Structures are given as structure tokens and as C-alpha cells.
Amino acid sequence: MEKTQMPVAREEKILVLVRLRPLNQKEIAANEAADWECINDTTILYRNTLREGSNFPSAYSFDKVYRGECPTRQVYEDGTKEIALSVVKGINCSIFAYGQTSSGKTYTMTGITEFAVADIFDYIFQHEERAFSVKFSAIEIYNEAIRDLLSSDGTSLRLRDDPEKGTVVEKATEETLRDWNHLKELLSICEAQRKIGETSLNERSSRSHQMIRLTVESSAREFLGKENSTTLMASVNFIDLAGSERASQAMSAGTRLKEGCHINRSLLTLGTVIRKLSKGRQGHINFRDSKLTRILQPCLGGNARTAIICTLSPARSHVELTKNTLLFACCAKEVTTKARINVVMSDKALLKQLQRELARLETELRNPASSPASNCDCAMTVRKKDLQIQKMEKEIAELRKQRDLAQSRLEDFMRMIEHNVASKPGTPHFGNHTDKWEDGSVSETSGVVDSDRRSFISDGMSTPLSISRAYVHSHSDDDDLDEDLPRRSEDLSEEYCREVQCIETEESVTVYNNKKDKRAEPENVLGCGEDANGETSVSQNVRVRSWNRRETVSGPSTPPENIGTGFLGRPESHKIAFPDLEFGSTVSRNDSMSSCGSDSTGTQSIRTPLGEEGGITSIRTFVEGLKEMAKRQGEVSNAEDSGKMRRDIGLDSMDREFERQRQEILELWQTCNISLVHRTYFYLLFKGDEADSIYIGVELRRLLFMKDSFSQGNQALEGGETLTLASSRKELHRERKMLSKLVGKRFSGEERKRIYHKFGIAINSKRRRLQLVNELWSNPKDMTQVMESADVVAKLVRFAEQGRAMKEMFGLTFTPPSFLTTRRSHSWRKSMPALF
């Protein structure tokens, strides 16, 4: 296998840590004095400076110094964790403990090894996009002989120089780790196999150098091309060196004396190598003088990151060995290593990966549905589709029933208008109907549902039909107009005058006179385009639609005829413009002179196209239609303001209505997972002013529609995008994550602390920014939090700097039109019932 490194090597010093253990029981019993003290996190001090013959420095500084009470977890987290985790990124690394006997080397390395391997496994579990392989091996050097700790035969192994891997141990056992329990089992085997013995200084003294190696290899799980098919391979070594000792202190003899000689000789060679490396590689460095230095050669100034933990005893009896350890540490911190990322990009590895991919594809081609699980999945999918089809058929049948019912009710309503015409000078002809003329049943395909004073009816195939309060009568009754006028009762006249707002007695006389003048030309009422510009045309005073009867239409969506002729002779200064209605099918009539489906005055019609599903109304298109309706209603209201009656509504009740609607919108925002930026703009722009009624109503109906769609498991179409409850929740999560990144950019440190305090976030907690954005707009019932949330989001998105540009976000102009700016405060609530 061909191994290459990244062209740029990272050059760094060896990390040197010093750990000073407390006095043990034997030293305390012997009344030993502690001559060493850690004065800060980087410096250790020798306190007995008055001792004779002391020519050593009294203070030593290193990367990190740990007192006796510091746990092994802190030593790992602060010092060696970063180096140990380099192995999963393709960088070789080594961690070893150096020190005198009974100073705590084995105790320290046991904890470091377990913590590091646990973090390596956590990293592997969190990065499932790559395939990892972890191999475990362990050896010991006992009396200059290499033994395999995973083998019980005790055979001595040989060292071999490999051109690719460097110095390797022949026939060393490598176990592929399965899980954490497997690792614990192997570590217990190594502990049992290692040579230990009892001396006067330590009851369990390590008599050999132990080296545990983890080799981590990772590659992408999917083939992403030759350039991306790289494999990373690196090793991490955990080395527990035997402690240096004096024979006079250890009182060793025989086997223990021989072991101590080999240990001291290998440690002396290691110290010589470290001292020469600290001087900049001047002269020959003989790594081959000891098997220990030969194995550690890559770790000492080579392709690896290295950390050395020097363990010390504070006892006065060990002061000379402690100073020797500190001198070794001072030389080690000057040694430089050049670690590289080991990337395997050989043609063999690429060929092997391509062969595996080819074999997998061939297997899928041979057995596309051979497994029982695949057949079961296919059968399950077919059953699900059948159930969906049956459900949709039932829904279609129900929608057709609702369409037929709505059409029949519409026909009955038109007949009622035709047969209940009453006449009086100055009063228009219209049917005896109430504000709510149908029982509230609305087609499920309707885009907006409103059961209060206005209703939307859909035939299931055409666009939703909006019936405004209009004053209509049949043109077939024009000839009998003079006969009907005298016979109309006064009671009925008064009732109709109460229903039609702002009709005065003077206007009634004027309308009656105009009606008498135009009665001689009833054909103008039926004209669709001939007299559109004439001064005597009735269409110039009343903007209405001429419809044909349902029996003569060309499509199922054509409405009945005889609806659109308004009352005649209204004065020019008080013209009323009604919103035009357009249907999905072309309206035709065999006996008509020209197309009667167009507006007689050329007024633009409100088009409400269907969504992609055919049954979902586009909210944006509907809002554009409401904008046009609002303009025309403004003209009506402007005319009414010039001397007409208004119902007096108390300001307190209007304020309560606004607060109720706003609270309902806040709760629907939370239910439908609406964007936080959308909530902020809407909350800050609409304060209950006179022109806000339109947008409050539109937003409320939009949210009700989305809530109903989500509760039934359906999709909602908004802005050309299909929304579901899951997708809206996902978009809201993405938006919160984006806002969390802006917190550090928009607010200073003091501002962030103040905001965290407002939202109850602890200053010393983690991921405070993410906690903050998760708290924004989280409680719609707490108006204080709502205002604070709007303020924070507005500052994050710089709402004040964007000005009027952001007032187009709903497809409407948020600035009130000129005809609304002169009206009384709170008058928007009065005009709401007449807008839809």
C-alpha cells in the first residue's frame, strides 16, 4: 500500500506535562518532608534551596504542572486529549509517562488510556459517514527482549525496518476492536501478562516498558470519485516506561538487580537521544543503542505528535531522582516534531473499493426482489397506495356532494331574490336576505374559511366564488318596475334602509328621478359592451357582472344568470364599485350579442387560480385579490363618509376585538411553526391602526387554513411551495440556527449578558446563543416575552435599517392608502364586515 502525507507538515514542540504526586503512606510514616511545590499552573518550585551542594535551579516551567490533588481526568482533558484525538484525523501521536520508580506512572497511563480510547469511540460513532477500523496491539520490553502481551507463549520478537511503516515488530498480534468491552478485556490481559515485581520502594513495581498501540484506519463509506476516495491511517501509542531506581534505595538483588540495570540503561539511552534532539540534531543520534529508542524513533522528532507526562515524588529522599526527571523534561520540551496527515491514495486501495462497489451492484442486478423482505415491502406499498386511492375517492365523492349542495343553494337564493323584489323610489332592488345567507357549510377546497358575515363557496372545479353584499335584481322585471314601486310597503322599505348603509332621503329622490329617465331604455341593462362609455349607460354608475343562466352555460363552473344588474340611477358622486368575480370556465350564451363574461366598465377582476393540487388556493394570489377589494371598499367608505350614517361601536370593545385576534394569531403562529422573522415584522408593523383590518383578517384566515390542512395531514401551498407540518418545523429549526449565528455579530458582550438575563439563561451555561433563539417566540401567552422576542429578532435582522422595503413581504403595501389616512381612529374595525 502506498502511503503519502500532506505536503505541509505541522511543526510543533513536544508537549511536556509534570504531575507531582502527594506523599504516600510509607513516606508519611517515615516523616519525609515535601521539598517540591507547584506555585502555579506552569511552574514547580524547589523549596529547600539552603541545602548544601545545591547547584540546580529552584524553579522549573513547563506547558502544564499538576498538583497532587488533581485527578487523572483533568490531566487528560487539559493536556493530552487533543493529541490523542489526532489519530482519527490521520496523524500519528504518542503519549508516554517518564519518572522515577513509585512516582505514579502506571496509575496515570491507565487512566489516560481509558479516557482516550473512550473519546476515540465516541468520535467514530458520531461520524457515520466514514468507515473506521481500530486495531489493538501491545508489547513489552523486558530485559531488552520484546514480548507480545496478547500471546502467552513468551517468545521474544524481533524488530524489522519497513520502508513504508518504519520500525515494526514482527509477528506482533493485532486484534480488531469490536466494542468497549472487547477493549477492557484486552487491557486486562495485558495487565496480567506484564512483568511486575516488589521492591522496597514499591510493592507493584513495573519491571518492563509497556507499549499499547491503536491503529485507526478510516475511509468514506460511499464511492465519491477517485479524488475523494482517500483512506486515512494513523497510530496512537500509550507508553508506560519503567521507573528509574537506585539499587541502594530499592535494595534490589539478583533478578531485581538485573531488571533495574536494563531499565536504567534504556532510560539513559532515551535521555541521551532527547538531549541531542533538543540541541537541533547536531551530530549523530544513535537510536539503535536501545530497542526502546528504536521503537520510539518516529515519536521523537519524527512524523508524530508527542506528549510526555513526567511524574514526580515530592519526598526529600528522592530529590536527586526528581531533579534528573525535571532535567529530562526541560530537554524534551525543546524537541520539535513534524506531524503530517497520513493519506493512503494507492491504486490498489482504489481498485479494491471499485471492486466492492461493482460486486454490490451486480448482486442487486441479479436479485432485484429475491429477498422476502423486498417482497413484503412491495406488498405493503401496494396496500398503502390502495388505501390512499380509496380515501381520495371518498373525498372526491364528498366534495361533489358539497358542490351540488352549494350550487342548489345558490340557485334557490337567486330565485328568492327574483320573486321577492320590492319597489320604492330611491331604493335599489335586492333580495330579502340576511348577512349570513347560507348555513356556513363551505367546500373543503376553499382557500379561506370565514363563517362570520361572509362565506366562500367552491364548486370543486372552479376558483372559489366570493359573494359580496350586492344590490341586484333581475332584468326581466324591469318592465314591471313602475308597478312594483307604488306597492312596496313602508315597513319593508325601512328594513332595507337599515340594511343598506348610508342611504339618505335626498339621494332617494335623486335616484328615483334618474330611474324614471332611464326606464325608457331598459336594453342598456343587458348591454355588455356597446354603451360601456356612454353617459347614459347604467354600467357607468354600477360596476357589476352580467351572467347567463346555468342551463345555457358551456362548463360546469359557470354561475347562474340574472345576478349582476345593480340598482339604477345612483348619483355620479356616490358610485359603488363591486369586486368582479371570474370563473374557471368561459361563460357563453347562445342568444347574447357579445361576450357577457367581461366587466361592462373594464374593471379588473380578481383572479384566484388554483394551486398545483387543484384544490389548494394560493394564499399569495388570494391576498392580491383582497388588496384590490380593499381599494374598492375604500372608495365605498370614502363616499359613505360624506354625510352617511355609521354604527357607533365603543372603542373598548374594538380594542378587545383587536387583542383577541392578535392573541389568536400568536397562538396559530406557534402551532403552524411560522417563521420568526415573519412574526416579528407582522407584530411590529400592525398595531391596530385603521388600515390594519385587511391584513389582520388575511393573516388570520391564512393561519386557520394552514392549521386545518396540517391537522388533516394535508399539504398547504404558499408562495409556490408545498408546506407540511414537518417541513415547516424543519424550516423553523434552520431559521433559529441562522439567528443564533447572528447573535455574536449584532450584540456586544454586555448586550448579550443583559438579553440572557431577560430570558433566564445562565451566563456560565453552554450554547447560550442556541438557548436564546429557542426561547424567542416560545410562549405566545406571555406578552412581555413576545415584545422582547420581537425586539431581539428585529435587531438581529436589522429591521429598522430596511424601512419600507420589507413592507411588501405579504404581497401588499403596508402603508395605509390615502383614503384611509383621514378616517377616524379605530375605524378599521367598523369596515371589516363589509370587506369579504
Curated annotation (Swiss-Prot):
Q: Name one GO molecular function term.
A: mRNA binding
Q: What is this protein called?
A: Kinesin-like protein KIN-7F
Q: Where is the composition biased (Polar residues)?
A: 588-607
Which biological process, per GO, is one annotated for this protein? microtubule-based movement
**Organism for this UniProt entry:** Arabidopsis thaliana
Keywords, in A-Z order: ATP-binding, Coiled coil, Isopeptide bond, Microtubule, Motor protein, Nucleotide-binding, Ubl conjugation
Q: What is the similarity comment for this entry?
A: Belongs to the TRAFAC class myosin-kinesin ATPase superfamily. Kinesin family. KIN-7 subfamily.
Q: Which CDD domains match?
A: KISc_CENP_E
